């Protein structure tokens, strides 16, 4: 069995191998290499070697010499919809259009089409520390960020690999200043078809044919909703509501009781929300955390690849509206409390029973 790392992503590479060794099987051991930063979107394609070269690529083969070896990823729009993201060169787009050689979608289509190719192990699953140039602490290869928050690509693979009906909509629907401008809306699903609504008005349905579904929509604030349909019935939905100014926080814990002295980790995901409880996807508020009772703070993170703060500090700046707090129980029993505070934000408390 032959394994292919990055060069296995290039046009014709796997076919060349199979032509010369038709009796051998292969596995894509480090394929595909694609980038995403959670909550970041660009409508025009990014190629690493051209747009954000790795240290080992600088001064090496230039883009003009390399571009014939990559699988095309068309721009979603003629002009960039999110030019403000150019202020953040270390963040990559979540439209599955930031890559080294091939998109995640094309890579899986290719894997399915070659019976002698046993599968692929994408690089990587989680963002990880290292292999990053200052001021980054990690690369953006993962489909889950370094705070263990899923990115949009996570749901792409869910649509490909699961049978439970699902639909995932991107991007979020809070784009102040872009009223009337065209926004690419992408949907991942495993349903027969998806119908899209803006403010309860249908924009029509599209059949699922194994590819992502794309609408180009003039932005208007309000509600965007995707409804997944199977056998004529709605079986899955996803929606976003346009957010107003940050007002409070929402706390969601993976557990609300834990045994005393346990090595279990309590993971609390925090969203900045507006006065109506709608998540604010651009919020970057600084939050402080106070832990009382039989609990202790293990660490905090926000998924930002360029933040270098100590993990054990009792405060954190949210990244794209989110952050995560990790707690653990002490030896004593009782009620533990996490208090979350932020400037001009409503304070919130979360109680954990230590039993």
Q: Model segments located where?
A:
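Short, hydrophobic beta-strand segments
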Residues: 214-219, 311-331
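Edge beta-strands of extracellular beta-sandwich domains
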Residues: 232-244, 346-354
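Short aromatic-acidic-glycine turn motif
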Residues: 247-251, 289-306
């Amino acid at each position: 069995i032959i394994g292919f790392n990055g060069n296995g992503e290039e046009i014709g590479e796997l076919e060349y191998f199979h032509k010369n060794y038709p009796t051998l099987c292969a596995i894509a051991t480090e394929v595909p290499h694609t980038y995403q930063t959670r909550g970041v979107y660009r409508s025009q394609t990014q190629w690493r070697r051209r747009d954000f070269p790795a240290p080992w690529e600088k001064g090496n083969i230039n883009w003009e010499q390399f571009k014939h070896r990559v699988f095309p990823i068309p721009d979603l729009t003629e002009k960039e919809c999110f030019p403000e993201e150019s202020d953040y060169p270390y963040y990559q787009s979540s439209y599955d259009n930031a890559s080294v050689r091939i998109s995640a979608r094309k890579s899986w289509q290719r894997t399915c089409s070659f019976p002698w190719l046993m599968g692929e192990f994408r690089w990587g699953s989680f963002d990880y520390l290292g292999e990053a140039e200052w001021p980054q602490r990690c690369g953006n290869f993962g489909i889950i960020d370094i705070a263990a928050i899923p990115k949009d690509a996570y749901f792409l693979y869910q649509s490909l690999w699961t049978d439970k009906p699902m639909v995932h909509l991107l991007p979020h629907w809070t784009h102040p200043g872009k009223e009337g401008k065209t926004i690419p809306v992408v949907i991942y699903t495993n349903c027969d078809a998806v119908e899209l609504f803006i403010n309860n008005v249908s924009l029509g349905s599209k059949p699922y044919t194994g590819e992502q579904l794309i609408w180009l929509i003039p932005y208007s604030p309000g509600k965007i909703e995707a409804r997944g349909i199977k056998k004529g019935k709605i079986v899955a939905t996803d929606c976003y509501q346009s957010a107003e100014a940050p007002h409070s926080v929402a706390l969601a814990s993976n557990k609300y009781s834990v045994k005393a002295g346990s090595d279990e980790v309590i993971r609390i995901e925090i969203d900045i929300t507006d006065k109506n409880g709608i998540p604010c996807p651009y919020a970057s508020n600084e939050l402080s955390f106070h832990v009382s009772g039989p609990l202790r703070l293990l660490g905090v993170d926000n998924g930002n690849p360029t933040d270098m703060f100590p993990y054990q500090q009792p405060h954190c700046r949210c990244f794209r509206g989110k952050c995560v707090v990790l707690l653990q129980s002490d030896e004593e029993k009782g009620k533990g409390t996490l208090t979350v505070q932020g400037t001009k934000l409503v304070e919130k408390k979360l109680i954990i029973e230590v039993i």
